[in-house]
């Protein structure tokens, strides 16, 4: 009886410890908070961003090739400048920050969370197959939304996990919704995604060889 009690106690403690080691994470957990900055463009509406982009494009054309922008386009520029100014948009200030903000956005998209490296995690996502053995996929990209990398541009690389699953996971469609469970690695990779119209190179910030893939 004493041995039975000891065995049950051991199994209970072991199961509890193992359960605590599995960390359920969300996609936002993969985004590093080390690259912080105030992005003034995030405060603009879609219409304001469009108008600002139009102004920047026309100015660039005029600068590269004087006289290439017609009278009608110049009139449109003036109208958009007047409209944005009335809305409180600092046109010159924003255009001057474009290069710096673009660089910071790139750094933020590439930055991974180093503290996640080596942790046993469980997360949800959509499988985009890269390679098959028979009917089973053995390499995938785990992405946060349906259509990523094919119907929409690729997510930032810290929002893509490269999955290598030697056991193979049978899937009859793209973007199968799944739970994956395994040791997460911070690893910068570039994977080739074969599309109907060519090959797309996808930058990835994380990798995993899961112990488990299951549909949901």
Predicted regions located by residue number:
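OB-fold and OB-like single-stranded nucleic-acid-recognition modules
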Residues: 19-216
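Sec-dependent N-terminal signal peptides
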Residues: 4-13
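Contiguous, function-dense segments enriched for cysteine-driven chemistry
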Residues: 16
């Amino acid at each position: 009886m004493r041995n039975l009690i000891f065995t049950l106690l051991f199994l209970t403690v072991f199961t509890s410890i193992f359960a605590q080691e599995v960390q359920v994470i969300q996609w936002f957990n993969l985004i590093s908070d080390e690259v912080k900055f105030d992005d003034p463009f995030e405060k603009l509406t879609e219409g304001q961003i469009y108008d600002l982009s139009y102004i920047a494009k026309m100015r660039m054309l005029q600068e590269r090739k004087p006289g290439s922008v017609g009278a009608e386009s110049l009139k449109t520029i003036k109208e958009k400048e007047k409209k944005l100014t009335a809305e409180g948009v600092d046109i010159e200030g924003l255009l001057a920050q474009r290069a710096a903000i673009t660089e910071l956005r790139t750094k933020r998209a590439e930055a991974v969370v180093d503290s996640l490296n080596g942790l046993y995690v469980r997360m949800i996502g959509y499988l985009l197959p890269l390679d098959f053995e028979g009917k089973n996929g053995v390499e995938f990209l785990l992405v946060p939304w349906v259509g990523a990398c094919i119907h929409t541009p690729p997510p930032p690389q810290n929002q893509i996990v490269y999955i290598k699953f030697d056991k193979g996971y049978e899937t009859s469609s793209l973007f199968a919704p799944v739970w994956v469970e395994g040791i997460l690695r911070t690893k910068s990779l570039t994977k080739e995604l074969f599309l109907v119209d060519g090959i797309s190179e996808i930058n990835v910030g994380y990798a995993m060889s899961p112990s488990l893939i299951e549909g949901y």
